[in-house]
């Protein structure tokens, strides 16, 4: 039996989950699990009755989709894309997004024809009931344009405001990180676990920056939080995108990540990765995090309370 944190609309709850195996077809370690999760070895994106697919089946095909989209974006990567106006920037961003979305949307829609589709990856807040695909076809898109390596393709299936599966693909390294509710988080076959660091003063922490159109109060809050962490943590990293920071928290490479406001596509993939890797999620004041929260904190259990204390000053 494994106790897992599951994200609900208004709070987190702890649920005992049994799973017998999750196929190595999409890179998950299976020997740690006992129970009922299985995946058809013959499932293909076409020819599968979506109503019969398990969440493990869906994750396997979601991985296939994000890898295909990532390959298309990798072919567009290399030279710095120059732009002289905001309009030129937006066109360049849209070209990348449309390229990946043209691959992702039909594939994911075939998997769950009745699932909703979040049209704007920058939207935040709670979703209506039911299933929704929350996708960022080029997370870290500006980095891609500047020939920087920190970008990814993400797809998350949300059910009644709980992320149930996510796939994050890093096209430049070929790595794929996955999480399935109750079955852990994995990076290319290796099960992930957050760090065991117990001293914020020895911790590497990270945050993202405010969006260009963000409210001034949020911008000031971001600045104040960075100042506070510079005093208390060992190293403070500030860059985008959020999901890559959260992947690093899940992998134990860094110890905490926080953000103010934030879009669903920024936070939901990483929230599932971190919770399935044994991390703690809350807002920056230590209250249960929900998509309605105005702040977000993901941390290793040993430094979570210290991070809350620092960010609450």
Positions of PLM-derived features:
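Short strand-turn-strand beta-turns centered on an Asx-Gly dipeptide
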Residues: 188-189
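N-terminal subdomain of lithium-sensitive/metallo-dependent phosphomonoesterases centered on the IMPase/IPPase/PAP
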Residues: 4-7, 26, 30-138
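An extended, acidic
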Residues: 195-313
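Structured N-terminal alpha/beta-domain signature
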Residues: 97-102, 116-119, 136-151, 171, ...
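DPxDG-like acidic metal-binding loop motif
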Residues: 127-183
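Short linear segments in intrinsically disordered or otherwise low-structure-confidence regions
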Residues: 9-11, 19
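Residue-level signal for inorganic ion chemistry
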Residues: 73, 108, 141, 170, ...
């Amino acid at each position: 039996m494994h106790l897992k944190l599951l994200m609900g609309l208004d709070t987190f709850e702890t649920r005992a989950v049994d799973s017998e195996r999750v196929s190595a077809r999409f890179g998950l370690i299976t020997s740690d699990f006992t129970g009922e999760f299985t995946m058809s070895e013959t499932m293909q994106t076409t020819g599968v009755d979506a109503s019969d697919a398990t969440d493990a089946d869906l994750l396997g095909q979601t991985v296939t989709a994000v890898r295909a989209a990532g390959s298309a974006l990798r072919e567009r990567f290399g030279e710095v894309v120059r732009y002289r106006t905001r309009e030129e920037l937006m066109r360049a961003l849209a070209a990348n997004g449309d390229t990946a979305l043209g691959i992702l949307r039909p594939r994911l829609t075939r998997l769950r024809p009745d699932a909703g589709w979040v049209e704007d990856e920058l939207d935040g807040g709670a979703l209506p009931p039911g299933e929704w695909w929350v996708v960022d076809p080029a997370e870290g898109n500006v980095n891609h344009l500047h020939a920087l390596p920190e970008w990814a393709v993400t797809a998350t299936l949300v059910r009644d405001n709980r992320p149930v599966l996510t796939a994050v693909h890093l096209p430049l390294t070929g790595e794929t990180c996955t999480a399935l509710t109750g079955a852990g988080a994995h990076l290319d076959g290796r099960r992930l676990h957050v760090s065991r660091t117990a001293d914020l003063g020895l911790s590497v922490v990270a945050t993202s920056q405010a969006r260009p159109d963000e409210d001034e109060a949020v911008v000031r809050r971001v600045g104040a939080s960075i100042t506070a962490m510079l005093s208390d943590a060992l190293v403070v990293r500030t860059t985008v995108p959020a999901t890559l920071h959260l992947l690093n928290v899940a992998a134990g490479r860094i110890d905490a990540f926080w953000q103010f406001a934030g879009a669903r596509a920024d936070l939901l993939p990483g929230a599932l990765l971190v919770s399935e890797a044994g991390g703690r999620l809350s807002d920056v004041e230590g209250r249960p995090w929900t998509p309605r929260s105005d702040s977000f904190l993901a941390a290793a259990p040993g430094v979570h309370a210290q991070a809350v204390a620092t960010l609450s000053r």
